[in-house]
From Swiss-Prot:
Pfam family, one: Peptidase_M48
Alphabetical list of Gene3D superfamilies matching this protein: Metalloproteases ('zincins'), catalytic domain
Names of the cofactor(s): Zn(2+)
BP GO annotations: proteolysis
Cofactor note: Binds 1 zinc ion per subunit.
CDD domains the record matches: M48B_Htpx_like (cd07340)
Protein's recorded name: Protease HtpX homolog
InterPro entries linked: HtpX_protease, Pept_M48_protease_HtpX, Peptidase_M48
The family this protein is said to belong to: Belongs to the peptidase M48B family.
Domain of life of the native organism: Bacteria
EC code: 3.4.24.-
Membrane-traversing stretches: 14-34, 39-59, 158-178, 195-215
């Protein structure tokens, strides 16, 4: 059951990434048709922008992410229990030992970052380290180490980059169209008006950014389910992970502001959105995550 869930989540993520590139191609073709006079040129340009954006974000320094989240690196002497759990989970996962960080915050949370296992790092809040027992902490760290092993950080970064590229291209295309940079009316008469293509292009311009955001959220949620399942694979203790999630669910929001890109990295959404904003959670509901673990 565990390996079936892991395989299913991986397949769903691949499908979502394909959908993402289709959205990028659609918005590029739309801008090309409406503004540049060539949908082929717009399509190719959009894909190039998306790839460049993704590659540049992947190679951002781990230190930058840690600095943005007010995390400080600790040694084995400063936090021996925490350090040894990270070491144990990394050994079981067969990845290099990540760097270990602490965030001074009373909320219960943790995250991992790094484009590959060789330059990865794990961070946990002081609140998490104070409240969790060893089994629960192993579940949380196993979750973060699984993100590293499964290259989730890289996938999430690509998703953020592609969503940003779609929004950027849509914004530029809309402005150019609004300020008169669109196709000449003569062009439309020459090709018979092609009303359906025109309507599709305009709808793509409007709806693609929203669709990209929803796909990004779906990818993030699938990776959280996968990391939960992978953590249980490492610890062989589903109850430890379930107990940790129950405590995370009762946690208060982070005490310092967290930007949207960083929020997606945490094991528990640090902003604790409510109402309509919860529809745009980067994380699946904790109740759903617990339910999945109970059915393993």
């Amino acid at each position: 059951m565990l390996y079936q869930q892991i395989a299913s989540n991986k397949r769903k993520t691949v499908v979502l990434l394909i959908v993402f590139f289709c959205l990028l191609a659609a918005i590029g073709a739309a801008v090309g048709y409406l503004v540049l006079g060539s949908y082929q040129f717009g399509l190719v340009l959009a894909l190039i922008i998306g790839v460049i954006y993704a590659v540049s974000m992947i190679f951002q320094s781990t230190n930058v992410v840690m600095s943005m989240n007010n995390a400080r690196e600790v040694t084995e002497d400063e936090a021996p229990n925490y350090f040894h759990i990270v070491e144990d989970m990394a050994m079981v996962a067969q990845i290099p030992m990540p760097r270990v960080f602490i965030v001074e915050d009373d909320s219960l949370n943790a995250f991992a970052t790094g484009s590959k296992p060789e330059n990865a790092a794990v961070a946990a809040t002081t609140g998490l380290l104070a409240v969790m027992n060893r089994e629960e902490l192993e579940g949380v760290i196993g979750h973060e180490v699984s993100h590293i092993r499964n290259y989730d950080i890289r996938i999430s970064t690509i998703a953020v980059a592609l969503a940003s590229a779609v929004t950027l291209i849509s914004s530029i295309g809309s402005r150019m169209l609004f300020y008169g940079g669109g196709r000449r009316r003569d062009d439309d008469r020459e090709d018979g008006g092609n009303i359906l293509v025109l309507i599709f292009s305009i709808l793509s311009l409007i709806l693609a950014p929203l669709a990209a955001s929803l796909v990004q959220l779906a990818i993030s949620r699938q990776r959280e389910y996968l990391a939960d399942a992978s953590s249980v694979e490492l610890t062989r203790n589903p109850q430890g992970m379930i107990s940790a999630l129950e405590k995370l669910d009762r946690s208060e929001p982070m005490g310092h502001p967290v930007d949207d890109a960083s929020a997606a990295l945490y094991i528990n959404d640090p902003t604790k959105k409510e109402g309509l904003k919860s529809l745009f959670y980067t994380h699946p509901p904790i109740a759903d995550r617990i339910e999945r673990l109970r059915h393993m």
